[in-house]
Amino acid sequence: MADRGPQPWRARTTGALIGTACVALVATGGVVSSGNGKQAHHLMALGPHNIDPGADPVTTTLPPSTTTTTTTTTTTTLPPLEVLSISPAQGAEGVASGMPVTVVLSGPPRAGAPMPALVPAAKGQWTVSGSTLTFTPSFGYAPWSTEHIVVPEALAGPESSSFHVAGAPLLRVQQLLAELRYLPLDYGPTPGVSGLAKAAPIAALVSPRTLPGTFTWRFSTTPASLRALWTPGKESVVTTGALMHFEADENLPEGGPIDPQLWAALKEAVASRATDPVAYDYLMVSEALPEQLVVWRNGADLYKTPVNTGVPGAWTETGTYPVYARFWTTTMIGTDVDGYHYDVPNVPWVAYFNGGDAVHGYWRSSYGYPQSNGCVELPVDNAQVVWSMDPIGTLVNVSA
C-alpha cells in the first residue's frame, strides 16, 4: 500500500462512549495508538464532528469496581471461677438447723450458672450478692443429719463440703409437746392459742427451727409449785414428764435422750394433728398433818385422799418426780428402819416415781400420818382411783 502520508486520526466508536472517549483524549493529549499502527500527535480540541466513521475502533477497557469487606471476630476467654470459701466449714459439728450456707467465689457467677446443691435437699432460697452466694433454709435441716454442699462444675467446681447438723433444739421439742397437749402450756404467736388450733402450716409445725411465739399457761389455777418448775428452753422435770408420757403413748423407750427416733415420732404426731388423749394431771402430796394427796386435773382439784408417808429415818423425799413405772399389783421387798426384812406380795395400784418410792394402795387401819418406809400409801379403793389418773410421766410433788 502506498504511503498516504500523515492522515487525520480517525476513531470509530458508538453511543455514549463517543463523548467519554473524546473527553478523555482532550484531557490527555499526547500520543494515541490507532488500530492501523499509526500514531497521531498533539490532538487538540477533538469533538464528535472530527471522528471518522471509517476509522478502526479503539477499545477502552475500564477496570471493574471491587469492594472487599473484612469481618473480625474477637473471642474473650474468661478465667474460670474459683471457690474461695464455704460456710459452715468442712466437717463442722453441731450446726444449728436454721444456719444459712454461704459460698464465696472469686468473682460474680455467670448469667444462667446453676446454684450449688444441698444433699439431702432442703427447702430454701439462694441469693446472689456480687461474688457471694447465700442459701437460707425455709424450715431448717433435719436434726442429726449430715448436709453436703455441692458446687457444680458449670459454676465454679466441682467442689464439695459437708457439715453435721445439731440435734433438735430443746425449745423446739417443748413447742411440739405444747402443740400436742403434753404440757400444761400453750405455745403460739397469740397467747393462749396453740398452733394446732390455728391450723398452722404443717411444714412450719414440724420444722426443727424454733418458731417465734410465747408459752402461756393453759389454766389460770396452775399450782405455784408447778409453775416454779418451768423455764422455756431449759431442762426441767416438766419437760421430762411430758416426754415420758409421749414416749409411753408411742411405745418408745421411756426416759431416754432426745434422739432421731423420738424426733420423728413427734413430727409424725404433729403432722397427723394427734393430741394427748388424756387430761393433764398433777399429784400433790402434803406431809403436813393430816397428810393428804390431791389430784389436780386441767385446772381443778379433782380428787383428794388421806395418805401415809415415810417414818423418820425413811422419809419420803420432797421434790417433784415423774411416774416411771406402774403395776396393778407387785411384790415389795426391802428392809425397814428397824432392820426388819419384808417381802409383801400383791401390793395393789402401784406407781413408782422416785427410786423405790411409789404411790400405792396399802392396808392400814388409819391414814394421814407417817407410817410407811418411804412410799405414799393410800386406802386401797382410793389408790385405784388415783392409779387411773397417774400415767407414765405424771408429776408427783411431795412437800413438807
List each language-model region with its residue ranges.
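Exported/periplasmic cell-wall-interacting domains
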Residues: V278, W315-T318, F327, G334-A400
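Terminal targeting segments of Actinobacterial cell-envelope proteins
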Residues: M1-A11
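Sec-exported extracytoplasmic/periplasmic mature domains
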Residues: S106, R110, P152-A156, A178-L183, ...
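Cell wall/extracellular polymer interaction/catalysis modules
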Residues: A248-G256, P260-T318
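N-terminal post-signal-peptidase region of extra-cytosolic proteins
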Residues: V83-A92, V119-A121, G130-P137, L266-Y282, ...
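Short acidic, glycine/serine/threonine-rich helix-capping segments at coil-helix boundaries
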Residues: S160-A168, Q175-E268
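Acidic, low-complexity Ser/Thr/Gly/Pro-rich repeat segments typical of extracellular/periplasmic
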Residues: R12-V32, G37-S65, T74-R172, L185-P191, ...
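Extracytoplasmic/secreted envelope proteins and their assembly/folding machinery
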Residues: G98, T102, T146-H148, L170-Q174, ...
